[in-house]
């Protein structure tokens, strides 16, 4: 789960991580009032959406007086911001962060992520702050420094100091930088984050180490023990189809292709997408109906897939272990009738009650193409979609 920058900074502040003072605003008048309350000579007006690249898209403005705060708030609020992370459709700006300006001396990058290769949290840092870390990794990987953290003991002070020296934090500010990184790590672990990214981390003219931006992502599977974080969820920032899928315990991720996929099991779902790509097709989604899908869940899964106007055909690929193939077959038929499906539909069933499932499909009288294997199914749906 993602949260907004201002929310992330509030979480970090509670762990002793230094962030600029700021207030959220939902209207132009609230933005002006927030700037008045901050009482600083310079304010930064920042669009709040769940995407990076806001500055380049015109969503971050420096205001030197209240009139400029009003002007920028009017120009940003209610507009659709298109960045490299939003896709061409962009995201509507419904709230702003009004933040005190600061005298930036140098920008850095600091982030914590899970390294799946080592099964450890890794602290990454670079003195190339303010730019996309992926770009730094591609062009100048030698400028990224890493510390792998033993989960038994956590981030150690010497590791944070080594990072601070490697990215050339001024010696007199190393102590602050270490405290910053230790607080960031505590927030990451205690709040079950999957990403904690500060870009940029800055040193200021008055000798402070501060997070100028904050991106926190949380493990959705751990939200049951973080009610305070769950309350920060902004449904307006999420894909409507993903929200609908979550109501039925369906795992759905939209993609850019035109072949809808309905599969049980994440591994099989990824293999299905791979084989569709192998035969020169493009999957429109990842959709895992799970191991205990009912006919109702299958019907809802169809509706979600078909709500994507780019979908030109559907491939259902089910291995019946916990889930029985006859239940899936009944769900497919019910869904096809309910939604009035006119698109090509290829179904591959294997496992528990597979013969009964195939019999139900064959006797349905519907235009359903049966596949004998995953390869056969992928080839057929790619051919039908054209």
From Swiss-Prot:
The lineage of its organism: Bacteria, Bacillati, Bacillota, Bacilli, Bacillales. GO terms for molecular function: ATP binding; magnesium ion binding; succinate-CoA ligase (ADP-forming) activity; succinate-CoA ligase (GDP-forming) activity. It catalyses: succinate + ATP + CoA = succinyl-CoA + ADP + phosphate; GTP + succinate + CoA = succinyl-CoA + GDP + phosphate. Belongs to the succinate/malate CoA ligase beta subunit family. It is an enzyme of class 6 (ligase). PANTHER family: SUCCINATE--COA LIGASE [GDP-FORMING] SUBUNIT BETA, MITOCHONDRIAL, SUCCINYL-COA SYNTHETASE BETA CHAIN. Residues 9-244 form the ATP-grasp domain. Its cofactor is Mg(2+). Succinyl-CoA synthetase functions in the citric acid cycle (TCA), coupling the hydrolysis of succinyl-CoA to the synthesis of either ATP or GTP and thus represents the only step of substrate-level phosphorylation in the TCA. The beta subunit provides nucleotide specificity of the enzyme and binds the substrate succinate, while the binding sites for coenzyme A and phosphate are found in the alpha subunit. Pfam families: ATP-grasp_2, Ligase_CoA. Pathway: Carbohydrate metabolism; tricarboxylic acid cycle; succinate from succinyl-CoA (ligase route): step 1/1. Binds 1 Mg(2+) ion per subunit. One of its GO terms (biological process) is succinyl-CoA metabolic process. Mg(2+) binds at residues 199, 213. GO terms for cellular component: cytosol; succinate-CoA ligase complex. ATP binds at residues 46, 53-55, 99, 102, 107. Its EC number is 6.2.1.5. Keywords: ATP-binding, Ligase, Magnesium, Metal-binding, Nucleotide-binding, Tricarboxylic acid cycle. It comes from the Bacteria. The keyword ATP-binding applies. Substrate binds at residues 264, 321-323. Heterotetramer of two alpha and two beta subunits. This is Succinate--CoA ligase [ADP-forming] subunit beta.
């Amino acid at each position: 789960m993602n949260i907004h920058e201002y929310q992330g900074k509030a979480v970090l502040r509670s762990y002793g991580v230094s962030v600029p003072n700021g207030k959220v605003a939902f209207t132009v008048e609230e933005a002006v009032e927030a700037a008045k309350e901050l009482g600083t000579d310079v304010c930064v007006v920042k669009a709040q959406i769940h995407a990076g690249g806001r500055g380049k898209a015109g969503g971050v403005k420096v205001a030197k007086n209240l009139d400029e705060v009003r002007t920028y708030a009017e120009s940003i609020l209610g507009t659709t911001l298109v960045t490299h992370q939003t896709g061409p459709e962009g995201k509507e700006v419904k709230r702003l962060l009004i933040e005190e300006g600061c005298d930036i001396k140098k920008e850095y990058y600091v982030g914590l992520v899970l390294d799946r290769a080592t099964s450890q949290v890794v602290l990454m840092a670079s003195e190339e702050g303010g730019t996309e870390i992926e770009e730094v990794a591609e062009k100048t990987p030698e400028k990224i420094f890493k510390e792998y953290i033993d989960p038994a003991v956590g981030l150690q002070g010497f590791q944070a100091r080594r990072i601070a020296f490697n990215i050339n934090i001024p010696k007199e500010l190393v102590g602050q930088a270490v405290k910053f990184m230790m607080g960031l790590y505590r927030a990451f672990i205690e709040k079950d984050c999957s990403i904690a990214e500060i870009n940029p981390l800055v040193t200021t003219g008055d000798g402070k180490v501060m997070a100028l931006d904050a991106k926190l992502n949380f493990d959705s599977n751990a939200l049951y023990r973080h009610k305070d974080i769950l309350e920060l969820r902004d449904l307006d920032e999420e894909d409507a189809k993903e929200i609908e899928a979550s109501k039925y315990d369906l795992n759905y991720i939209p993609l850019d292709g035109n072949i809808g996929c309905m599969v049980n099991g994440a591994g099989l779902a990824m293999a299905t997408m791979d084989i569709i790509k192998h035969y020169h097709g493009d999957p429109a989604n990842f959709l895992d109906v799970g191991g205990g899908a009912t006919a109702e869940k299958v019907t809802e899964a169809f509706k979600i897939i078909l709500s994507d106007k780019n979908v030109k055909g559907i491939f259902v690929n089910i291995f019946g272990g916990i889930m029985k193939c006859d239940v899936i077959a009944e769900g497919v038929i019910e869904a096809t009738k309910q939604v009035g499906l006119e698109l090509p539909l290829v179904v591959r069933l294997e496992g528990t009650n597979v013969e009964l499932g195939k019999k139900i499909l064959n006797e349905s009288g519907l235009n359903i193409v049966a596949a004998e294997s995953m390869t056969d199914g992928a080839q057929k749906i790619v051919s039908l979609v054209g």
